[in-house]
Structures are given as C-alpha cells and as structure tokens.
A protein has these predicted regions:
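Membrane-interface helix termini and inter-helical loops of multi-pass transporters
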Residues: 122-137
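Transmembrane alpha-helical core residues of multi-pass small-molecule transporters
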Residues: 13, 56-64, 80-81, 103-108
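Mid-bilayer segments of alpha-helical transmembrane spans in multi-pass integral membrane proteins
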Residues: 70, 105-122, 147, 151
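Hydrophobic alpha-helical transmembrane segments
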Residues: 7-12, 32, 54-58, 74-75, ...
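Hydrophobic transmembrane alpha-helices
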Residues: 1-55
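Alpha-helical transmembrane segments and their cytosolic interface
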Residues: 136-182
Length: 182
C-alpha cells in the first residue's frame, strides 16, 4: 500500500480521535471516551501495522495536551487507555497465553498506578489527602474494581476484534482501497 494512503488514514483516525477526546469535558464521558478512542486505533493497527497505530496515538495525545480536554481523562488516555488496545494485539502474538495474560495484567496495574500518581501528585486532584485510612481503602478499592473493569474491557476488545474481522474488515479495506487478502 502506498504511504500516502497510510498517512491519510492515520490523519483521519487521529482527527476523529482528537474530536472525540474533546468530549471528555462532559463528565459522563470522562473514562468512556478515552477507551473508545483507544478502540478506534485498532483499525490502523490491524490494517496498517502497530507503528502506524502508535503514530495515531501519539498525534492524538499531543493534540489532547494542546486542546482544552479534561486533564484527568487525558492522563488515563495517555497512560493506559490509548495505547492498551494496540499493545494487546502485540502481546497476544506471544505463544504462551498465560505469559500474555500475566503481562497484560502487570501492564494494566502499573499503568493504572502511574496514572493515579500523576492525577494525584501532578494535577493535585486528591480529595482524600487528609484522611490516610480512607485514601488507602479507596486506592485498594480502585485497584480491585479497576482489575474487574480491565477483564471486561479486555474481553470486549477481543470480541470487538473478532466482530471487525467477520463483519467490517472487507468494507474498511475497500474504503482504504486495499487488496482483499482474506
């Protein structure tokens, strides 16, 4: 495929992702929109390769820093939800399914702790700063609920990828003017 088609495709997906990130200013979309934008980059990853999907992720991240997006959502997008769907595809290419699951779980927990560190220490959004016990209980609760949400998110990504291959890939490839290699 010509590089102009790849660049144009990345530009379109980056623009769409950036516009969606602007929706994080609406409180109900605080965590859902960054997850959806990350899912959006599965198409460039599956059709063009991981480096092009990471390019879309990088462009959207930089534009999110420049434009007026909700900072907490942007931290979650840059630190976890934006790159995870791309990394998931790369991790699932490993031969050992157990190693892949352990690696994904470790990546998620490290990224989640890092995101919350940035949110609390850099952005200063710690509402339980003076209450040590409550903050500890809250942190453990967030990790537990976050891991449950991660499992659901990972399963949903897998099913979404399967649905893409079954129902939408042919149309996307036609729109991108790619030869059908199915």
């Amino acid at each position: 495929m010509r590089s102009t088609v790849k660049i144009t495709t990345c530009g379109i997906f980056s623009a769409l992702g950036t516009v969606l990130l602007l929706g994080t200013n609406i409180p109900i979309f605080l965590y859902t929109v960054p997850a959806i934008v990350g899912i959006l980059f599965l198409i460039p990853c599956l059709e063009l390769g991981a480096k092009w999907a990471f390019l879309c992720y990088g462009v959207t991240s930089v534009l999110g820093l420049i434009l007026p997006t909700e900072r907490e959502a942007l931290v979650m997008y840059i630190g976890l939800l934006g790159f995870y769907p791309i990394v998931k595809i790369l991790i699932e290419r490993l031969k050992s399914r157990i190693a892949g699951t352990v690696l994904k779980t470790l990546l998620f927990n490290a990224a989640l702790v890092g995101c919350f560190f940035v949110i609390i220490k850099v952005l200063g959004l710690n509402v339980l700063q003076n209450e040590r016990f409550s903050a500890t209980v809250m942190a453990v609760g967030i990790l537990l609920i976050g891991n449950l949400a991660f499992i659901v998110y990972d399963i949903a990504l897998t099913r979404g990828i399967n649905l893409y291959f079954i129902k939408f890939r042919r149309s996307v490839r036609r729109a991108l003017r790619m030869k059908n290699e199915l």
